[in-house]
Amino acid sequence: MTTGTDVRISLRLLFYELWDNNAKLTKNKTTTPTTSKTTSKILFNSKRTTPTHGYDADYIAELSNNFEFAGFTAPTPHNIRKAFTRLKIMFERMNRYPDEIFLSRHRMLGFVIYQPETSGPIPAFHPKCKFYKLSDNHTHDEKIEIVKNHILNGEIVKTVDLKIDQSFESYYYDKSNAQASQKFLASMHTCDFSFLSFPYINDLTATELGLLPEWAAILLSYMKIINVRGIYNDVVECIDPSQQFCVFEIIGSLTGISNGHFWSVLNDRRSMDVIAKEVEKIALDNQPFXKDGNLNHLLFNSINLSDPLNFNIFHYSFKLKIFPTTLNPLDDLVLLRMKDLIKAFNAGNDVQVIGNKCIGKTRLTAELKKKYLNLLIIDSDDYGKFITLLLNNCPNLFLNNDFEINDEVFEEEIFNVTVIEYANVIRDGTIVIETFFERLMFEIMSLNLTNGEYDVDAIFHSFNARFHAIVNSSMIGYRLFFTKFRKLMFDNFNYTQVLHFVHSYSELSFYPHCVAYITLEPSYNPCCLLYKNRVKRFLSITRSDKGVSSELFLHQFYEKFTTKVNPTPVFVFRYYFGLTNGLSISELALDENT
């Protein structure tokens, strides 16, 4: 069992009671028979007429599991509803909440009952019910303090003072309807408030937060909450003008020829002279690109000012020079598109990011998952991997090379079971699945290889026809998979929003939920990494002294279907989403032994 210190509870799950099918409680206010004319009217859901029934069984189970996993006892949905009713009245009367109920586990909280002298005695509502009769022999301020202390002790304070009645959560005991009054007041008094002191994660979207009633929005400021959607706090309007801008020159150690210039923002407040001397000592010699630091760190935190860097991944040796600059090469249209994407993201919408192979989506995914815990990152290879899994479950899925579906063996249930299986694979994170489209590309390449030469046009034409036959399928297509996959992940794992990586512009239309997109551009030539990766992949083949993989052909295919108008540098995406503060020289100086 984990403890509440390392796992936090879903705020969206707690606030379920504020939504009808996750929509708002009805705004029709109803006065209960026990509510004083001077007290607040009570919001309640007209569709739920019984206090212990009518709650969705899946919600109850998920609520219990979520609290238990965090190391706490879950409140019942009915208890949460009662607590929200009382909290609303508290806020309307006091314009605040008692701090004490959020600091320690206050199980029972008292309230005020207005009792005119003529109303007669009030019986105990339940065995643990305790009353305190407020004397009139005190000043108003003294009465306020006395009432507060007794309420925090769980006692019901009886008073004839209307000013006190109107300063606290208060009710009226209706002697003419004693049975109903006792039942209602007993239910309110036995409400357990201890769940307010538990830690929560704010997994509500910006739209949902904006729809919260005032009492609920203010309630959040009292609770122990971590905002998992860090974009609300960390998104920036522009590059921080107080940071230093710089240009790096990368020079081949053997040739002395400049291999490129890169612009960056320094996450380093030291003087440029000190930084320049430190940079001169850095030698980028045969460092594996996959390691943090050095070339990897430089390229992910900078923008190329010329052609993307080309290099032999297996052997390179670079020297660095750094120059201060006031230049900001970012195109206004690039920044406008970036801000439009963030605006849509902050509003709770799903967004898409176009990124071809080997531009760094794996690293971005890891960073985004760490920062935005309730953001579902859909990888550009997810659909291809799903098709591989589907073929494992239904080997005779396709009738022919045109990928017509074999209706005699394929059933919808196979598709649904495979979606669940793939979700478990994603959650596990250790199972490696090849994407079907790499295998398909390899087979097409093999059929179009003559005398050691590839017919590139024929390869792309054949792959394009087969690729779109699969993704457009009404039975196993792209849209169907992602719709079911998204719903499954949202329903079972508390995801609230999607960031969907795709390979090319042509894939945007297949995903129905996104309202904004950008195209990412790396500061290096991704083909360098594709050559490196070929030696590790079983689909690779050799032509003369160079490795040509299906991945490289896929990269070129996707490139044909991606517009390069105003692309967004990877560094800009990382900076605006709060994934980096700029280039750290200390990380750049790391060698392979650190």
Swiss-Prot record:
The keyword Cell membrane is assigned to this record: no
Disulfide bonds: none
Keywords on record: Host cytoplasm, Host cytoskeleton, Virion
The organism's place on the tree of life at top rank: Viruses
Location relative to the cell: Virion; Host cytoplasm, Host cytoskeleton
GO cellular component: host cell cytoplasm; host cytoskeleton; virion component
Function: Minor inner capsid component. Displays NTPase and RNA 5'-triphosphatase (RTPase) activities. May function as a cofactor of polymerase VP1. Associates with microtubules and plays a role in the formation, structural organization and morphology of viral inclusions, where the assembly of cores and the replication of viral RNA occur.
Protein name (record): Microtubule-associated protein VP8
Gene name as annotated: S8
